[in-house]
Protein backbone atom coordinates (compact mmCIF):
# COMPACT_ATOMS: atom_id res chain seq x y z
CA UNK A 1 0.00 0.00 0.00
CA UNK A 2 1.43 3.37 -0.98
CA UNK A 3 2.01 6.19 1.49
CA UNK A 4 -0.49 8.37 -0.41
CA UNK A 5 -3.19 5.72 0.01
CA UNK A 6 -2.47 5.43 3.73
CA UNK A 7 -2.66 9.22 4.11
CA UNK A 8 -5.91 9.41 2.14
CA UNK A 9 -7.57 6.74 4.27
CA UNK A 10 -6.43 8.13 7.62
CA UNK A 11 -7.39 11.75 6.85
CA UNK A 12 -10.53 11.18 4.79
CA UNK A 13 -12.98 12.47 7.43
CA UNK A 14 -10.56 14.60 9.44
CA UNK A 15 -9.03 18.03 9.03
CA UNK A 16 -5.44 19.01 9.70
CA UNK A 17 -4.74 21.73 12.25
CA UNK A 18 -3.82 24.03 9.36
CA UNK A 19 -7.13 23.44 7.59
CA UNK A 20 -9.03 24.08 10.83
CA UNK A 21 -7.13 27.32 11.44
CA UNK A 22 -7.78 28.49 7.87
CA UNK A 23 -11.51 27.72 8.07
CA UNK A 24 -11.96 29.42 11.45
CA UNK A 25 -10.00 32.50 10.39
CA UNK A 26 -11.90 32.85 7.11
CA UNK A 27 -15.27 32.49 8.85
CA UNK A 28 -14.25 34.89 11.66
CA UNK A 29 -13.33 37.47 9.02
CA UNK A 30 -16.74 37.04 7.39
CA UNK A 31 -18.46 37.51 10.75
CA UNK A 32 -16.34 40.58 11.54
CA UNK A 33 -17.35 42.08 8.20
CA UNK A 34 -21.04 41.73 9.09
CA UNK A 35 -22.09 38.23 8.00
CA UNK A 36 -24.93 36.66 9.98
CA UNK A 37 -24.02 33.79 12.32
CA UNK A 38 -25.38 30.39 11.29
CA UNK A 39 -26.06 29.40 14.91
CA UNK A 40 -27.85 30.94 17.88
CA UNK A 41 -25.21 32.97 19.71
CA UNK A 42 -27.24 33.71 22.84
CA UNK A 43 -26.12 30.52 24.64
CA UNK A 44 -22.40 30.80 23.89
CA UNK A 45 -20.09 31.63 26.81
CA UNK A 46 -18.13 34.06 24.63
CA UNK A 47 -19.63 36.21 21.93
CA UNK A 48 -16.55 37.07 19.86
CA UNK A 49 -16.23 36.16 16.18
CA UNK A 50 -13.59 33.46 16.70
CA UNK A 51 -15.70 31.61 19.29
CA UNK A 52 -18.72 31.80 16.99
CA UNK A 53 -16.68 30.49 14.04
CA UNK A 54 -15.30 27.61 16.15
CA UNK A 55 -18.78 26.63 17.30
CA UNK A 56 -20.15 26.77 13.75
CA UNK A 57 -17.35 24.45 12.65
CA UNK A 58 -17.96 22.02 15.54
CA UNK A 59 -21.70 21.88 14.80
CA UNK A 60 -21.06 21.25 11.09
CA UNK A 61 -23.18 24.09 9.73
CA UNK A 62 -20.53 25.79 7.59
CA UNK A 63 -21.02 25.39 3.83
CA UNK A 64 -17.27 25.10 3.21
CA UNK A 65 -15.33 22.51 1.22
CA UNK A 66 -11.59 21.92 1.61
CA UNK A 67 -9.67 21.14 -1.57
CA UNK A 68 -6.69 18.83 -1.04
CA UNK A 69 -4.09 18.26 -3.75
CA UNK A 70 -1.91 15.17 -3.30
CA UNK A 71 1.64 14.75 -4.66
CA UNK A 72 0.39 12.31 -7.31
CA UNK A 73 -1.93 15.01 -8.69
CA UNK A 74 -5.14 13.63 -7.21
CA UNK A 75 -7.60 16.23 -5.93
CA UNK A 76 -9.91 15.47 -3.01
CA UNK A 77 -12.80 17.64 -1.87
CA UNK A 78 -13.71 17.34 1.83
CA UNK A 79 -16.97 18.85 3.01
CA UNK A 80 -16.72 20.42 6.46
CA UNK A 81 -20.24 19.18 7.18
CA UNK A 82 -19.06 15.54 6.97
CA UNK A 83 -15.97 15.90 9.15
CA UNK A 84 -15.83 14.14 12.52
CA UNK A 85 -14.65 16.05 15.59
CA UNK A 86 -13.51 14.39 18.81
Curated annotation (Swiss-Prot):
**Protein's UniProt keywords contain Cytoplasm:** yes
Is the Nucleotidyltransferase keyword given for this protein?
yes
The reactions it catalyses are: RNA(n) + a ribonucleoside 5'-triphosphate = RNA(n+1) + diphosphate
Subcellular location, principal: cytoplasm
Q: InterPro entries from the entry?
A: DNA-dir_RNA_polK_14-18kDa_CS (IPR020708), Pol_omega/Rpo6/RPB6 (IPR006110), RPB6/omega-like_sf (IPR036161), Rpo6/Rpb6 (IPR006111)
Q: Which PROSITE patterns match?
A: RNA_POL_K_14KD
Keyword annotations: Cytoplasm, DNA-directed RNA polymerase, Nucleotidyltransferase, Transcription, Transferase
GO biological-process terms attached to the record: transcription by RNA polymerase I; transcription by RNA polymerase II; tRNA transcription by RNA polymerase III
Q: Where in the cell is it found?
A: Cytoplasm
SMART domains registered for this protein in UniProt: RNA_pol_Rpb6
Gene3D superfamilies from the xrefs? 3.90.940.10
Q: Which HAMAP family match?
A: RNApol_arch_Rpo6 (MF_00192)
Say what the protein does: DNA-dependent RNA polymerase (RNAP) catalyzes the transcription of DNA into RNA using the four ribonucleoside triphosphates as substrates.
What NCBIfam families does the record tag this protein with?
Answer: PRK01099.1-2, PRK01099.1-3, PRK01099.1-4
Identification of the protein by name: DNA-directed RNA polymerase subunit Rpo6
Organismal lineage: Archaea, Thermoproteota, Thermoprotei, Sulfolobales, Sulfolobaceae
